[in-house]
Structure formats: C-alpha cells, structure tokens
C-alpha cells in the first residue's frame, strides 16, 4: 500500500530529536515525528506526593498540554476552561504510567521527577511521541543527577517507547498522520519496553470491529516500529 505521504504501510514518519532544547530543565528534548512536534522537559523536586512521604521512594509523573494553535483550529487552554480536559488527564496518566514502568522508584530517594509534554504542533500521534521523547528527557535528567552526585546510579530498569497503528481503508498502517488517523476505522496506541514486554495496549474500533488475527498483525507491526524507535533513542542516549 502506497500512502498519501509516500510511505509504505510499515514505515515511521521521519523523526528528529533535539536534546537540550530547553536551557533550564534537568533534561529536555524536542521530538519531531512527521509534522507532530512535542517539547518534553523534566524537572526534579526534593519532595514526593503525600502517600510516599517517609517511604524513601521517589516518583515520576507527567503533565500534558497542547498549545492553542498546535491544531488546525484553536484549542482552548485547559487553564482558560478552569479544569484539565478529560483527554489531557487520560494522556498524562498514560505518559506517567509508561515512564514509571521503566524506573526503579526506590533508587530516586524521596524525589519527584515531573515530565512536561507540551505539543507545539499536532499531526496525530502526540501521546506516543510524548512517551518516546519523555524517555530521552528523563534519561538526560537522570544522567545529570548522577554526574552531580545526587543519584548514585542510573535508575532505569528498561527502555520504553510508543507508537500508533491504525486500520485505514482496510489496511494496517504504522504511525498514521492526521489524515489517516482522522479517517481510521480502528486506532491503536502501543507502549513497549526493550524486553519486548507491552506496557500498554489501547485499541478502539471507531467505525469497524477487528478480529484477534488483526490484533496480532497490529502488535507485530507496532513492535517492529518500536524497535526502530529504540534505535533512535539510543542514538541520543548511547552515541
């Protein structure tokens, strides 16, 4: 299948990652995946949520937002609406869960690492790009803390990345752009670690149901895409 942007069904969009995109964050990247662009930045605080106080254990959490004109028509800021939208809550919880799955929280001490994922341009796949970029930003933050003697070792237990897969006009396609995502019959978001273990599988039938065989094909295609993302992450973290 030849797609509208010239890619084959199993190709990711072009990906560029710029580390150190923000000067003041403990770790930061700009991830560009096709026309989707997300700034991922990490801040460290010497405190933890109430439920972790005096536990000796740290925390990793995330916040997600979209700039008003990251979309074709203006998206209202959550602050203007007076509450975080349900979509933003869902996505930031997903990002937080995904990153916590690959970190030894006890190795952080009683410290919190807050990941801010701010979408500056949305062309589908913002939540998965946020996870892939957030891993690198968190890696850079941890490395800085180790270099400063604040952490005794890198606290990662695995590597994590994410990708979207859609069924578009009856075809399974990797990393859909907006036009494909908008018209997709089925949408999937896959999060996986480098032990080939899935952290999260989200699948929604928008206009068509799907079979177990189709699900297996989606997982196989998504897994192949995530291994490519691991290589891209490693080009920054393990040059």
Curated annotation (Swiss-Prot):
Gene3D superfamilies in UniProt: GHMP Kinase, N-terminal domain
Class of the enzyme per the UniProt entry, highest EC level: transferase
SUPFAM superfamilies, sorted: Ribonuclease PH domain 2-like, Ribosomal protein S5 domain 2-like
Keywords: Nucleotidyltransferase, RNA-binding, rRNA processing, Transferase, tRNA processing, tRNA-binding
One MF annotation (Gene Ontology) recorded for this entry: tRNA binding
Biological processes, Gene Ontology terms: rRNA catabolic process; rRNA processing; tRNA processing
CDD domains: RNase_PH_bact
PANTHER family, per database record: EXOSOME COMPLEX COMPONENT, EXOSOME COMPLEX COMPONENT RRP41
Functional note: Phosphorolytic 3'-5' exoribonuclease that plays an important role in tRNA 3'-end maturation. Removes nucleotide residues following the 3'-CCA terminus of tRNAs; can also add nucleotides to the ends of RNA molecules by using nucleoside diphosphates as substrates, but this may not be physiologically important. Probably plays a role in initiation of 16S rRNA degradation (leading to ribosome degradation) during starvation.
Family statement: Belongs to the RNase PH family.
Name of protein: Ribonuclease PH
Natural source organism: Dehalococcoides mccartyi (strain ATCC BAA-2266 / KCTC 15142 / 195) (Dehalococcoides ethenogenes (strain 195))
